[in-house]
């Protein structure tokens, strides 16, 4: 499970008869949240320095050399490290005084429409709040419907904490992950927010950077060549062997693992819980996934530490993002930030602030329910919408 996901900002306490381990996990998560604010600035600087250190690109996992020499890696264009450097610069340069933006809600909406219409380029930065707006929630009714049996047996109360749970065996652990993957990666979200966003920017010169790993931009029809998923993809496995710097598609495995648990397909072909509610919480041993290259174990391709595999596709997307930013350092650029939380601001939020401050023609627009703000230093170039993302997108289109 990737610690650096902005999706996982809110948790619900675990409860139930057999929830001792789950409660301990929740206590650790809650304790972490209590100390995040005071160490936020330190954390962002430390993470940035860690990502930008040269050895990250040549040595991983205790000194095991991976594909590509240090010289080869550092010669590659890397939008990820570029944007993190900009983020750190923004934190240092723009100060701590924040604003909710200038003007009434109506005035800001008028300015946003004008900025979108007149933009030479649009850079979309998307975090967990966008998928939440689309209905891909990790707790509540949706969780209870999909993971009711895991909740009853293990006391797990949301998908986030379930990703940390020390399940008793691989068969149970991968049964959990098959459900998590399927219902967040291989189905369309309940609300068409991503498709509405696509309609909003269709025909425009646009690029997307996102910390989300649910593949929803591509499902909605966004051009893969204009997408950079920085933190991985629920649809990919990677080997536990650090010498294998490849990723492996898991769609066929996921479908088999869902059927093996007793999920049934409805008239549209989507998996549903059977009417009798009888599901297995394990998959057969021969379905436990393994690396097709050497037979070793696999893990999710989600960024948690320096073992995360940045495969050829990731590097192409990173280079494309770097090229797009460099091609639009000046001119009328709209930096449209959607649902970016406080877990990974150095990847999207802070770089957007810094790039806006460097370009007097740029506009920074932040749409984020309860978390829309900007530095006072760029207040005149900023638009802040403290509302549901889907609602704002609908209003822009009116």
Language-model segment annotations:
Residues 2, 12-13, 22, 31, ...:
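Ala/Thr-enriched low-complexity intrinsically disordered regions
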Residues 5-7:
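Polybasic, low-complexity intrinsically disordered segments
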Residues 10-11, 18-21, 33, 43, ...:
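Short terminal hydrophobic/aromatic SLiMs and anchors at protein ends
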Residues 38-44, 49:
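N-terminal targeting/docking segments
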């Amino acid at each position: 499970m990737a610690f650096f996901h902005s999706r996982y900002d809110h948790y619900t306490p675990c409860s139930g008869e057999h929830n001792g381990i789950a409660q301990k996990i929740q206590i650790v998560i809650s304790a972490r949240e209590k100390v995040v604010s005071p160490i936020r600035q330190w954390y962002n600087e430390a993470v940035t320095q860690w990502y930008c250190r040269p050895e990250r690109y040549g040595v991983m996992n205790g000194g095991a050399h991976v594909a590509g020499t240090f010289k080869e890696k550092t010669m590659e264009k890397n939008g990820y490290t570029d944007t993190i450097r900009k983020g750190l610069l923004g934190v240092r340069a723009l100060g701590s005084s924040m604003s909710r933006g200038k003007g009434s809600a109506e005035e800001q909406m008028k300015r946003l429409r004008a900025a979108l219409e007149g933009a030479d380029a649009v850079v979309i930065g998307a975090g967990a709040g966008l998928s939440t707006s689309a209905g891909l929630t990790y707790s509540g009714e949706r969780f209870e419907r999909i993971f009711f049996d895991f909740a009853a047996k293990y006391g797990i109360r949301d998908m986030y904490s379930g990703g940390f749970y020390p399940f008793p065996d691989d068969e149970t652990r991968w049964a959990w992950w098959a459900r998590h993957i399927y219902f967040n990666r291989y189905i369309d979200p309940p609300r068409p927010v991503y498709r509405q966003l696509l309609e909003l920017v269709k025909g425009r010169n646009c690029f997307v950077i996102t910390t989300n790993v649910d593949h929803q931009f591509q499902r909605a029809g966004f051009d893969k060549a204009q997408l950079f998923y920085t933190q991985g993809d629920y649809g990919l496995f990677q080997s536990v062997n650090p010498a294998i710097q490849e990723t492996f598609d898991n769609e066929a495995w996921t479908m088999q693992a869902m059927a093996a648990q007793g999920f049934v397909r409805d008239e549209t072909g989507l998996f549903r819980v059977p009417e009798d509610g009888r599901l297995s919480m394990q998959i057969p041993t021969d379905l436990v996934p393994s690396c097709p290259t050497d037979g070793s174990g696999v893990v999710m391709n989600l960024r948690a530490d320096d073992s995360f595999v940045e495969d050829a596709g990731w590097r192409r997307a990173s280079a494309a993002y770097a090229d797009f930013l460099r091609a639009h350092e000046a001119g009328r650029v709209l930096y449209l930030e959607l649902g970016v939380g406080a877990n990974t601001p150095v990847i999207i939020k802070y770089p957007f602030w810094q790039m806006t401050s460097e370009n007097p023609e740029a506009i920074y627009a932040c749409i984020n329910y309860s978390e829309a703000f900007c530095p006072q230093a760029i207040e005149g170039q900023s638009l802040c919408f403290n509302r549901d993302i889907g609602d704002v997108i609908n209003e822009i289109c009116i």
